[in-house]
Amino acid sequence: MQTLGLSGESRRSDGRLKSIFWPTVENAWDVNYLGQQGFWICVVLAAIQLVVAAFSSNLVVLAAYLAAGLVYLMGGMGVRESSWPAAAIVFGIFFTGLLYTVMMGHLPGIVDVVITCILLSNVRAAFLASEWKPAGEGEDRPTRFSETMMDKFVDQLPAKLWPKIQPFFFAVAAALFALELFGAGAVAWHRSSGLVVAPHP
């Protein structure tokens, strides 16, 4: 069974909901499934950033959303290849954006909170996958398919690109994370100094 490239479900240890919010890794199928799942989560986030950017007339905002979309997409490739640092920085960028919203005096929406929890769970999944070792050399493992465009996108592209784009990803992601952290810190400092008036309800 294959849904959006999420294959090997019959041998997974967890149900779908648990794998999203509290994943565990007991075999190679768990590693493969969680990598695919984390990849799609990041791809969806990247698509959202691009949609928002498409409707923005402010060049600074446009550039910020395009950069975030690129980082989420590349980070998804890292997650597919069991890179927990990639998952961690994707979570950090999204969480810092949420923190900025709070600092501006707005409560985050339910969807934002759920996405934050999923991204944090993504870090756990990537870490567990990176630490998992097969019991033996000949242990059965899921196949990475390449028959369809979806297979190539989910199973083949991350494996080919991630080793090459890692330095670029971490450089861009670190810069974006630092800018967001600086922005949230600046807003917090101004608010504590009384220089920013809280919005009226």
Region spans (language model):
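Topology signature of small-to-medium multi-pass alpha-helical membrane proteins
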Residues: 2-200
